[in-house]
Amino acid sequence: MNTYEGNLVANNIKIGIVVARFNEFITSKLLSGALDNLKRENVNEKDIEVAWVPGAFEIPLIASKMAKSKKYDAIICLGAVIRGNTSHYDYVCSEVSKGIAQISLNSEIPVMFGVLTTDTIEQAIERAGTKAGNKGSECAQGAIEMVNLIRTLDA
């Protein structure tokens, strides 16, 4: 039986990051977590490109453009959608998650889902670097691991 796993060796990995500006007080912390992790794992700063979009709904379009460019080994998508008093939250969360998944499947590169979908601002804050860790950092680590797993499977 063969078992395959990725590792956290960041040799020659190029990363695209798409960040939503809406709820920037949260998303900027997710971005900081992702960048800190990538630097800690020795991803070269020149191999990281960040694109800011107005909100979470716009993330899939830019992630798709990045994937089609073939410049990146992985794409990290960061946003924060916080439930309000209308059904808008449900539509945005559903479409963003479907869009990101579809891009990954179509492009066959890792597109990491770092879009927080929370009921409260407090829950978002917890996931952006306090009690529940930093989902941006987790996505960066997952991106490196997935790139290496794909490289292993393609070898």
Curated annotation (Swiss-Prot):
Annotated keywords: Riboflavin biosynthesis, Transferase
Reaction it catalyzes: (2S)-2-hydroxy-3-oxobutyl phosphate + 5-amino-6-(D-ribitylamino)uracil = 6,7-dimethyl-8-(1-D-ribityl)lumazine + phosphate + 2 H2O + H(+)
One example of a Gene Ontology biological process annotation: riboflavin biosynthetic process
Molecular function terms from GO: 6,7-dimethyl-8-ribityllumazine synthase activity
CDD domains in UniProt: Lumazine_synthase-I
InterPro entries: LS, LS/RS, LS/RS_sf
Pathway: Cofactor biosynthesis; riboflavin biosynthesis; riboflavin from 2-hydroxy-3-oxobutyl phosphate and 5-amino-6-(D-ribitylamino)uracil: step 1/2
Any one of the GO CC terms: cytosol
Enzyme class: transferase
Lipid biosynthesis found in the keyword field: no
E.C. number(s) listed in UniProt: 2.5.1.78
UniProt binding sites for 5-amino-6-(D-ribitylamino)uracil: 22, 56-58, 80-82, 113
Active-site residue list: 88 (proton donor)
Function noted in UniProt: Catalyzes the formation of 6,7-dimethyl-8-ribityllumazine by condensation of 5-amino-6-(D-ribitylamino)uracil with 3,4-dihydroxy-2-butanone 4-phosphate. This is the penultimate step in the biosynthesis of riboflavin.
Name listed for the protein in its UniProt record: 6,7-dimethyl-8-ribityllumazine synthase
Species name: Streptococcus pneumoniae (strain ATCC BAA-255 / R6)
Name of the gene: ribH
